[in-house]
Amino acid sequence: MVTIKDIEAKTMSPEKRQEAKKDLFAFYVGRPLSYLLTIPFINTSITPNQVSYLSLLPLGLGLGLILLVPTLAGQVLAWLCFFLWNLLDGVDGNLARYKGISSPMGSVVDAMSGYAAMFISYLAMGVAASYRSAFGFWKPEWLLVLGALSGAFVIFPRLVMHKAINTVQTQESQQLKGRKNFGLAEVIALNLTSISGMPQVFMLIAILLGWNDLFTVGYFLLNGLVMILSLRKVLR
């Protein structure tokens, strides 16, 4: 029988481990749980790409719950859907590396799922904030816009970075890949903004305490700042 240790041994090289450890919540919580969730898929004909497509379902369900069930229970269920996406986002890569069937298109599909999660998660919190918030002076439509912009701020510098890597093709542009060259500030930014990391923890806390507006405004400011600094690094 395949065990968690078997999956970890076949899917986590020393180099990948060093990079993955920089995202603390994803490495110490999300990744071990993704190993457990990978086991049922090992002896099936389900492909990694199919898992990536499957991961879009909880994202859509979570957004639907946020829109249609504007209660604490509905928002907690939505968060569970987003967390399930987080785990499935690890399963597709685990499955690909375990079976040795990684492909360039698999990376594209995985990125598509990740971009969808980034935008939907922050948008959903903007919607949630328009229903339940700690302070009454925010206009609901402001919070919706801030949530949508926050999601866009996370995605936009990544698109510019990938264009720079594929177009400029200098040594400096290639160093933008991965996390190997991350300094302390970049590691902190990664932990605070990676949608598979601490934002999910802060999201749950905000939902439980009714601080959806504080989450939305705070991440609008943080993601905007990180976007500006990231673009400055790419375009210098």
Where on the chain are the PLM-derived regions?
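Short, contiguous, helix-prone interaction/anchoring segments in small proteins
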Residues: 32-52
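A feature for the membrane-embedded catalytic helix bundles of lipid/isoprenoid biosynthetic enzymes
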Residues: 2-38, 111-236
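Membrane-interface alpha-helices at helix entry/exit sites of multi-pass transporters
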Residues: 104-112
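C-terminal ends of transmembrane helices
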Residues: 39-40, 93-98, 231-232
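A generic hydrophobic-helix recognition signal that picks specific residues
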Residues: 40, 82-85, 103, 147, ...
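Membrane-interface starts of transmembrane alpha-helices
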Residues: 47, 51, 73-74, 106, ...
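Alpha-helical transmembrane segments of multipass membrane proteins
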Residues: 39-40, 60-67, 201-205
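Membrane-embedded alpha-helical segments that form the functional core of polytopic membrane enzymes
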Residues: 48-105, 122
